[in-house]
């Protein structure tokens, strides 16, 4: 009986020791969780091989990322200008595409900064002070090889007035008025011509009046409406003109003289020629 009691007492003690070891292991696990806060971590016995858990892998990755971020921050703080210049170069490469010069050769030939002799710029630059945009002036220099070509008219020039009308006759833009001065053209600039002031005024003078204007003082105030000026039709005027011509022909008959006879005139002229020849001989 005593031996059976001792066996039961030893079994109870063993069970209590297992429970105590289990509670201590649970407390150790809770302490490790509260201290790390990353995940589950199991402490195995020294004799058994260690098994990696998800918490270990996450902590390793966190250490790697922290080290890389610290290195990148130090490198960025050491060279901010190089990174900004690289980004600017990339943006320029993306935003400014290359222009094919072979596709549009005539446009590139016009934008020459200098002439063939390389002495003066061919295009003028006028900045717009009213805005922030600086653009090139429309057109080239006014003088080409020392010659102003703004007041020269080309032979191949055709205006709208010339293209209208009949084929045989051209429409005269001046309506028959001759040129009085060399610069009498609206599309030319005579002030740029050489010695333009010696030719006189650029505009034609007013010459449609024969004499100077004389101012007349008209103080007549009619008390009743004046009679209208008679305006006869054309057939009445033509009939009156024919009547005047007939009256004049009849009046000229009073001064009529008979013509000289033909034979008498012929003989008289022949005698005159014979006498002149005899005198010469």
Swiss-Prot record:
Which residues are recorded as modified (Phosphoserine)?
A: 71, 74, 77-79, 91
Q: In which tissues is it expressed?
A: Detected in pachytene spermatocytes and round spermatids.
In this chain, the stretch annotated as Disordered covers 1-92
The highest taxon in the source lineage is Eukaryota
- Per the UniProt record, the source organism is Rattus norvegicus (Rat)
Is Phosphoprotein one of the keywords UniProt gives this record? yes
- Does Phosphoprotein show up as a keyword for this record? yes
**Protein name, entry field:** Spermatogenesis-associated serine-rich protein 1
Organism lineage reads as: Eukaryota, Metazoa, Chordata, Craniata, Vertebrata
Kindly state which keywords UniProt assigns to this record, in alphabetical order: Phosphoprotein
Regions of compositional bias (Basic and acidic residues) in chain numbering: 1-14
- Residue ranges, compositional bias (Polar residues): 21-37, 54-65
Q: Report biased composition (Low complexity) as residue ranges.
A: 66-85
The Phosphothreonine modification is found at 53
Name of the encoding gene: Spats1
């Amino acid at each position: 009986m005593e031996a059976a009691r001792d066996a039961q007492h030893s079994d109870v003690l063993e069970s209590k020791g297992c429970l105590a070891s289990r509670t201590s292991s649970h407390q150790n696990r809770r302490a490790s969780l509260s201290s790390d806060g990353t995940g589950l971590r199991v402490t195995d016995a020294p004799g058994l091989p260690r098994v990696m858990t998800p918490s270990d892998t996450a902590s390793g990755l966190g250490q790697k990322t922290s080290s890389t971020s610290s290195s990148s921050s130090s490198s960025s703080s050491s060279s901010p200008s190089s990174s900004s210049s690289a980004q600017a170069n990339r943006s320029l490469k993306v935003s400014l595409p290359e222009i094919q010069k072979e596709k549009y050769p005539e446009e590139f030939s016009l934008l020459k900064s200098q002439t063939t002799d390389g002495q003066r710029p061919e295009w003028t630059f006028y900045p717009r002070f009213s805005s922030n945009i600086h653009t090139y002036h429309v057109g080239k220099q006014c003088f080409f090889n020392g010659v102003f070509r703004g007041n020269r008219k080309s032979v191949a020039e055709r205006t709208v007035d010339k293209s209208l009308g009949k084929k045989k006759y051209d429409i005269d833009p001046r309506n028959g008025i001759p040129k009085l001065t060399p610069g009498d053209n609206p599309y030319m600039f005579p002030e740029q011509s050489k010695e333009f002031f010696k030719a006189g005024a650029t505009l034609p003078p007013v010459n449609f009046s024969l004499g100077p204007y004389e101012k007349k003082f008209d103080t007549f105030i009619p008390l009743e409406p004046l009679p209208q000026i008679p305006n006869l039709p054309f057939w009445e005027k033509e009939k009156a003109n024919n009547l005047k011509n007939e009256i004049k022909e009849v009046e000229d008959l009073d001064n009529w003289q008979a013509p000289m006879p033909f034979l008498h005139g012929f003989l008289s002229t022949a005698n005159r020629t014979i006498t002149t020849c005899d005198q010469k001989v």
